[in-house]
From Swiss-Prot:
Sorted UniProt keywords: ATP-binding, Ligase, Magnesium, Manganese, Metal-binding, Nucleotide-binding, Protein biosynthesis
Positions bound to Mn(2+) 2: 260, 262
Positions bound to Mg(2+) 2: 260, 262
Cofactor note text: Binds 2 magnesium or manganese ions per subunit.
Domain of life: Bacteria
One Pfam family recorded for the sequence: Rimk_N
Name of the featured protein: Probable alpha-L-glutamate ligase
Annotated positions binding Mn(2+) 1: 248, 260
EC number: 6.3.2.-
Species of provenance: Pseudomonas fluorescens (strain SBW25)
C-alpha cells in the first residue's frame, strides 16, 4: 500500500515509528507536512497538491494532526477522503473529538460514565454552576487546552469563583468538573485500535501535582484493566467514531469515568511502558480495513 502520514514533523517519535512499521511491512510511507498541502476543490477531480505536485495513488492516510492545526488538518484529511483515500481516523470524528464539550455531550447521551460537568456563559450563574458539580474541590478546564495546559484545581468555592470569573473575563470557554479525589492523581490511558484495547498504562501525577499528563512530569506504569474499563474505552471510541483512540479513564467509587477521547494519541509513552509494537498494530489494522475508495465518509463530509 501507499500510505500518507499527515504530520508537521517527521522526526517526532510517533511519526517515525509509524513510518518504520509501515516500511517493515512492505508499504511505501510518505510523510506530508499538513500545512504545506493545499487543495483544488473541483467537482469531478478533487486534488491535493504538495510542493508543486499533485498527490496521487495513495491507498490510505494516517492523520497525526496537532490540536493547533485541527481546522486546516481536518480540511486536508477531508480532501483525501473525497479522493477515495482511506483514513485511519475520519475527519468528522477528529473534529468531533477535539471539541471537549461536544465529546462529553455525545458520551453522556450513550450513558458512558463521566465526571459531573457544568458549562455556563454568564458570571451570574457561577455559584449555581459550582453547586451543580457538587461544590469544591473542583477542576476547571479551558476547552481548547491540551497536555494539561489550562487545567486548574480549585480547593474552595471562593477560589473557584475567582478563577471562573477570570477565565470568563478573558472570553475563554471553560467547563467545570467534579474532582475525583479517590483517583489519587492517576488515570488510565487505554489505547484502542479497531474493536480492541491493545495496550493500557497507568499515568501517575508527580507529587504535589494532580495532572497526570506525561508532558507535565507524570510517570507511566503497566496496569491490568478491568472488563468494565475495557468496555468503557471501546464504547467511548465507538461513540466518537474513532478507529484509533487514546481513551483516558479515572477509577472512581462509582466505576470508570471517561476524561477524554484523544484522536491522535502519542505512541512513545504506551510503547515504552508496555513494550508493545503499537505502530505495527496500527499498520496491520490499516491493511485489514483500508484500501482505495473504502472511506465511509466519502460524499458525506
Amino acid at each position: 500500500m501507499k500510505i500518507a502520514v499527515l504530520s508537521r514533523n517527521p522526526r517526532l517519535y510517533s511519526t517515525r515509528r509509524l513510518v518504520e512499521a509501515g516500511v517493515e511491512r512492505g508499504h511505501e510511507m510518505v510523510v506530508i507536512d499538513t500545512l504545506r498541502a493545499y487543495m483544488n476543490i473541483a467537482s469531478h477531480k478533487p486534488q491535493i497538491h504538495y510542493r508543486g505536485k499533485p498527490l496521487e495513488g495513495f491507498d490510505a492516510v494516517i492523520p497525526r494532526i496537532g490540536a493547533s492545526v485541527t481546522f486546516y488538518g481536518c480540511a486536508v484529511l477531508r480532501q483525501f477522503e473525497m479522493m477515495g483515500v482511506f483514513p485511519l481516523n475520519e475527519s468528522v470524528a477528529i473534529a468531533r473529538s477535539r471539541d471537549k464539550l461536544r465529546s462529553l455531550q455525545l458520551l453522556s447521551r450513550r450513558g458512558i460514565g463521566l465526571p459531573v460537568t457544568g458549562f455556563a456563559h454568564s458570571p451570574d450563574d457561577i455559584p449555581d454552576l459550582i453547586d451543580m458539580v457538587n461544590g469544591a474541590p473542583l477542576v476547571i478546564k479551558v476547552l481548547e487546552g491540551t497536555q494539561g495546559i489550562g487545567v486548574v484545581l480549585c480547593e474552595t468555592a471562593t477560589a473557584a469563583e475567582s478563577v471562573i470569573e477570570a477565565f470568563m473575563g478573558l472570553k475563554q470557554n471553560i467547563m467545570v468538573q467534579e474532582y475525583i479525589k479517590e483517583a489519587g492523581g492517576a488515570d488510565i490511558r487505554c489505547f484502542v485500535v479497531g474493536d480492541k484495547v491493545i495496550a493500557a498504562m497507568k499515568r501517575q501525577a508527580k507529587p504535589g501535582e494532580f495532572r497526570s499528563n506525561l508532558h507535565r512530569g507524570g510517570s507511566a506504569s503497566l496496569i491490568k484493566i478491568t472488563p468494565e474499563e475495557r468496555m468503557t474505552a471501546l464504547r467511548a471510541a465507538k461513540v466518537m467514531g474513532l478507529s484509533v483512540a487514546g481513551v483516558d479513564i479515572l477509577r472512581s467509587n462509582h466505576g470508570p469515568l471517561v476524561m477524554e477521547v484523544n484522536s491522535s494519541p502519542g505512541l512513545e509513552g504506551i510503547e515504552t511502558t508496555t513494550g508493545k509494537n503499537v505502530a505495527g498494530i496500527i499498520i496491520e489494522h490499516l491493511e485489514k480495513n483500508g484500501g482505495p475508495n473504502m472511506t465511509r465518509t466519502k460524499g458525506k463530509g
